[in-house]
Amino acid sequence: MIDKILKLKKEKGYVILAHNYQIPELQDIADFVGDSLQLARKAMDLEEKKILFLGVDFMAELVKILNPEKKVIVPDRSATCPMANRLTPETIEEYKRKYPNAPVVLYVNSTAECKTLADVICTSANAVEVVRKIESDVILFGPDRNLAEYVAEKTGKKIFAMPEDGHCPVHQFSENSVDIAKKKHPDARVVVHPECPKPVRDKADYVGSTGQMEKIPEKDTAKTFVIGTEVGMIHKLKKKFPDRNFIPLESAICVNMKKNTLENTLLALETESFEVTLPEDIIEKARRPILKMFEIMG
């Protein structure tokens, strides 16, 4: 099946982009594997006109927004993000009425419609830097309350989370898990995602996006790392650092990320039917705050 996928991909001129949370078999056949920021940048640099995206819907939409002239297909239309879907345009409008002078910073894990109402988009890798560079001490941030809290801690700014209870179910690790991991692996470094709750972040040795997690073993010589994010990241880390040990903090599985399989990836290439499409006005309006992010990042 893998040979069939690679043959079809080449014949039809597709590039396969995969998120770090995809199953190992899909990561291994992808042309590029990365976090949402890395994938967004990669998509803009591609010469190819056809992209098979392995992730969830908001990420595929992001690729389409940045590459409206390219054909973007996905293996499973139902692969979505519950956290992104918690935030609605109506909620953003409500907060904007309450705080009319506060800029709206939206996490990339948001719908295309919501992005049209943002002043700037951010990712978990650059959220702190983006907010720090905005000339306002009050920020409206959504849809992840934990990332909002983390950014507030790092920048000292007043941040209102939209909605108040937005969070990623996969990253709701327990403080107890960190205690157990440290007891079991006393020499290990605990690395967690900023989408984790504050008590978990506070007990970790490092807090960072999946892209940042990849860089930690380059500067830290520890032999063992306990990783607090979706389990798909373990495969990426083991491939990059085969001489180190990577242990999941908990068995955290994103069922939506796992909807993509070798079988439906092959089917997607055969039929090219699940194409990502967005209205032109949505693409145009959602593109502005994304490009603003790149401008801020320099």
Swiss-Prot record:
Pathway this chain belongs to: Cofactor biosynthesis; NAD(+) biosynthesis; quinolinate from iminoaspartate: step 1/1
Binding positions (iminosuccinate): H19, S36, Y107, V108, N109, S124, H193, P194, E195, T210
Keywords annotated in UniProt: 4Fe-4S, Cytoplasm, Iron, Iron-sulfur, Metal-binding, Pyridine nucleotide biosynthesis, Transferase
Subcellular location: Cytoplasm
Main location: cytoplasm
Cofactor(s) listed in the protein's UniProt record: [4Fe-4S] cluster
Job of this protein: Catalyzes the condensation of iminoaspartate with dihydroxyacetone phosphate to form quinolinate.
Family: Belongs to the quinolinate synthase family. Type 2 subfamily.
Record-given protein name: Quinolinate synthase
